[in-house]
Amino acid sequence: MSVNSDSPILRIVVVISVMVMSQGCDKLGLGTSPTQPSGPPAAGSTVVYSAVGASDANGVGSSVPCAPFDTQCENGMGYVPVTTRQLRAQGFNVTLLNLGIPTAVIGRDFQTLGQQYNRIIAGNFIDQEMMFVQPNATLVTIFAGINEVNVVTAALGGGAGGSDPNGYMDAQVRAFGTDYTTLLAGIRTRAGSPRIVVLNLPNPAGLPYLAGTSLAQRQAAQRIAVAMTRTVVNPLLSSNLVVVDLMCDSRSYIPSFYSSDGLHPNDAGYAYIASEVVKAITSSSYPAPQNSCPAMTIVP
């Protein structure tokens, strides 16, 4: 999720942090990584947790957001630190590395596209986060999609797609899928087979930040998000990858779960997300995501 472009301090911190980490650290393949698929962690075990994400991982919109690369942020109210505290309360010994970068998108292609249409994007998951996943990670969470939807709708508003906007949107969804494949492959190259929890995205057409926009923009956002969920994220479900279904959970559309910008969750919204992430981490039978639900057709 994006941060407010009127926050210069946050932008400076993000850009400097990305530059330092990009220049000062290694690429893939460091250390010894696990090789066996990871199911739910055993009760009381050690959980080595890497969180890949954008401003949602930092808890932007909450009462206690975490600064970029404040890898612990013990009192943060975003879903990543709340998840960590809940796991510890259940007896797990959790080591957290929060890699979230506000404004980030999944890959360089979306970063370049967004910058072309004047969106502030400080980095991407593949280039600035994937390489820092702990080699001994036993748990990785990933939340991508909303910033990418906003990039594509901004491009459409700037004339991209020409006479075939649907074809353009569908091509961007395929690019998102390619990037997701690259991201997961890189994480597994680095960390072996950790338990991976990915979050599909809610339908932006039902979120407060688009409430005052045109029907065409909401239709475009819905088309992109639903396609990303159905064709990219949900099919990732496997024995060691769990999908949290934000798209079809009615709680994703409760207005009071969002901060004043209408995009980022507030404390209540992040608490809801964290509760589902914890269940996905610890359950041996977490429900599969739905591929059809009323939330997929919020606008006609």
Predicted regions and their residues:
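A structural motif corresponding to the C-terminal end of an alpha-helix
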Residues: 84-92, 179-198, 227-245
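Conserved SGNH/GDSL esterase-like catalytic core that processes O-acyl groups on lipids
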Residues: 61-178
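Short acidic/His/Gly/Ser-rich catalytic and metal-binding motifs that mark active-site loops
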Residues: 58-61, 107-108, 148-154, 205-211, ...
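Active-site segments of SGNH/GDSL-like serine hydrolases
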Residues: 143-147, 156-157, 184-223
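N-terminal secretory targeting modules
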Residues: 1-94, 135, 284-300
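Extracytoplasmic/secreted proteins, especially bacterial periplasmic and envelope-associated proteins
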Residues: 51, 78, 82, 168-182, ...
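Catalytic His-Asp segment of secreted/periplasmic serine-dependent ester chemistry enzymes
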Residues: 201-300
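Structural recognition of the beta-strand scaffold that forms the well-ordered cores
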Residues: 48-59, 95-100, 138-143, 148-151, ...
